[in-house]
Regions:
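Conserved phosphate/metal-binding and DNA-contacting active-site motifs used
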Residues: 1-204
Length: 204
């Protein structure tokens, strides 16, 4: 139910844009609209309903626009959950606590059955981060069968970028899902073993 999912995402303060269905690894995560405007503001629910009607069978889900329009949202994208675990284990205590209590979305499946991880962090107003990719000093004995990218990579995404939101079907055949999130996370967006955090309302 895309309108309900969109309404929930908007209620959590995210600016969203519609994405085309993922047909294969070369034609994935593609916006269905010109999205410059939504780097400055979030759409209204009526705009979203129009997208759902207009794109119908082509709609694969929504992307989350990072940075200021989503409440100063920083997303850390780990290509493999072992890279996420390494980062957490080596992060300073306050950073580790922040990340462990932030919303966590699982992404595509890798060759070893493990998944990528997106961590959503809201920064204080006035703070910003440069978009960048970082190769972490960890060996991961797996691969993405569809793409030739290192799985020890961390993608840092803020203003001017977007990430695929929960509910989207990845080309590996699984849906992006929320592993840790607000207690009112819709059932269709929850990963198996979902953990709801009552205090996450304060994060929004």
């Amino acid at each position: 139910n895309w309108p309900d999912i969109a309404n929930w995402l908007l209620d959590k303060g995210f600016s969203i844009i519609p994405l085309a269905k993922c047909e294969d690894a070369s034609n994935c995560k593609r916006p269905l609209i010109q999205w410059d405007e939504y780097q400055r503001r979030a759409p209204g629910i009526e705009e979203v309903r129009k997208w759902v009607r207009e794109f119908k069978d082509r709609l694969g889900g929504f992307a989350i626009v990072c940075g200021k329009p989503s409440g100063n949202l920083l997303v850390l994208g780990f290509e493999h959950e072992d890279a996420y675990k390494w980062f957490i284990e080596n992060a300073p205590g306050q950073v580790r606590q922040l990340l462990e209590n932030s919303m966590r979305v699982l992404t595509g499946v890798r060759s070893d059955g493990k998944r990528g991880v997106h961590v959503y962090v809201r920064l204080p107003a006035g703070y910003g981060v440069r978009n960048t990719d970082i190769v972490l000093p960890i060996q991961i004995n797996a691969e993405d069968p569809h793409k030739k990218e290192p799985l020890n990579k961390l993608e840092v995404r803020f203003d001017g970028r977007y990430v695929v939101g929960p509910g989207y079907r990845h080309y590996s055949g699984v849906d992006y899902c929320i592993a840790i999130g607000p207690e009112d996370t819709p059932g269709e967006l929850r990963c198996q073993g979902f953990v709801g955090k009552p205090d996450m309302a304060l994060w929004y």
